[in-house]
Amino acid sequence: MKTLGEFIVEKQHDFPHATGELTALLSAIKLGAKIIHRDINKAGLVDILGTSGAENVQGEVQMKLDLFANEKLKAALKARGQVAGIASEEEDEIVVFEGVENGKYVVLMDPLDGSSNIDVNVSVGTIFSIYRRITPLGTPVTKEDFLQPGNKQVAAGYVVYGSSTMLVYTTGCGVHAFTYDPSLGVFCLSHESVRFPATGQMYSINEGNYIKFPNGVKKYIKYCQEMDEATHRPYTSRYIGSLVSDFHRNLLKGGIYLYPSTATHPNGKLRLAYECNPIAFLAEQAGGKASDGKNRILDIQPHELHQRSAFFTGTESMVNDVERFIRDYPDNV
């Protein structure tokens, strides 16, 4: 049995940014995940369910657990001294850590993805993305450090809190997954070098918004539902409503996750920095693909901290198919 800590140290030499600082940073995320796991598991017994009464910068109502997870991760990252600042879906602006001006890294995160599912005991997750800072060491970080394209990520990953708690991460040398053993208090290697299956037969999208989708996406959904033995269609529709949970299933089983732009969200709804980039990094490292329907997600230059994007990710051939439908069936302008 190999623990997450042992595995990280063992693999340090495999990637160009191998430093003890990054190892300690990942350990801080591991600690935050353990704390969140503990409190999610007693969510129905203590007063952390429901809304907080506050809204985030996007005007969305914040759940109590959103704020709890944000504070716990922020504290864990600041305490280690490797992170000079963070950006979070739950924070209006970047958070600069005072006294850590020599920290080499910045972290962007969605502390609790799918938190509205907590009240009904459905899986949720944490998403994180790590970059080397651009500004000089010894100075406070600025927004410039956070507005880097996804192809500059040093590491990324997620934690899924479900029937078991699993941490999945990449440093650019494959995707590895660790399952939490609560009796020992450690994450143990359970899936090494995870790869998408060559073909997939699941699609994940909120079909309740069908009327708002672009023509190409509507055509693709119909394609998924058609009978064709040669391509093993119709595909199976599976949608949880938590990006982490839907992506995790499709990663292991083969499939595609779709969150297109809509009439009400013409730029898409998912956040490029906190959701799309880290998941895209994982997807590509697992042999999959991630796109906004036209462009590679990791090549998009962000201009705003909370910038949104359409998002299609999963088995490479399936993402290629949806891109083709979007290209062949444009909306009437």
Swiss-Prot record:
Substrate binds at residues 113-116, 206, 239, 257-259, 269. One of its GO terms (biological process) is gluconeogenesis. Gene3D superfamilies: 3.40.190.80, Fructose-1,6-Bisphosphatase, subunit A, domain 1. Mg(2+) 1 binds at residues 89, 110, 112. It comes from the Bacteria. GO terms for molecular function: fructose 1,6-bisphosphate 1-phosphatase activity; magnesium ion binding. Its main location: cytoplasm. Pathway: Carbohydrate biosynthesis; gluconeogenesis. Binds 2 magnesium ions per subunit. Keywords: Carbohydrate metabolism, Cytoplasm, Hydrolase, Magnesium, Metal-binding. It is an enzyme of class 3 (hydrolase). Its cofactor is Mg(2+). It is found in: Cytoplasm. One of its GO terms (cellular component) is cytosol. Belongs to the FBPase class 1 family. HAMAP family: FBPase_class1. This is Fructose-1,6-bisphosphatase class 1. It comes from Sodalis glossinidius (strain morsitans).
